[in-house]
Regions:
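Structural signature of nuclease core domains in nucleic-acid processing machines
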Residues: 1-130
């Protein structure tokens, strides 16, 4: 989990990100890997193929529960900053190319805070409004 500067809408001025790294090989087996093998489209395919969005959502629930317990003035919509999946084989340090402002090898998603809260409640056995 990373604590990063947030907006002024939080009591401590920070938001929190779940970060996970992956070493998946997304290129062709008959040629060397390049950062182009880790563009947004391929990352989305890899995420879906491996059910990483579900993993990200569950990690977000865990973070939500921790912050609810430990963060004074906790507000899910302000404090939950989303998830980053770092596909290390596609990242090239400062030379990592950008496509539409997104670095190769980095998948980001900010699940709606209401989804995280509702899933937490559901997993806790509570009724969730339809």
């Amino acid at each position: 989990v990373l604590r990063v500067p947030g907006d002024s809408g939080t009591s401590d001025g920070h938001r929190y990100l779940v970060v996970d790294y992956k070493t998946n090989w997304l290129g062709e087996s008959d040629r060397p890997l390049t950062a182009a093998d880790y563009d947004r489209g391929r990352l989305a395919e890899a995420m879906l193929h491996s059910d990483y969005p579900l993993q990200a959502l569950l990690y977000s629930v865990v973070l939500h529960r921790f912050l609810r317990w430990r963060q004074p003035g906790y507000r899910p919509d302000a404090h939950l900053g989303g998830v980053l999946y770092l596909f290390l084989r596609g990242m090239c340090g400062p030379d990592t190319p950008l496509a539409d402002g997104h670095p190769a090898g980095v998948f980001s998603w900010r699940p709606p805070a209401a989804l995280v809260v509702d899933l937490s409640d559901l997993l806790d056995g509570q009724q969730v409004a339809a």
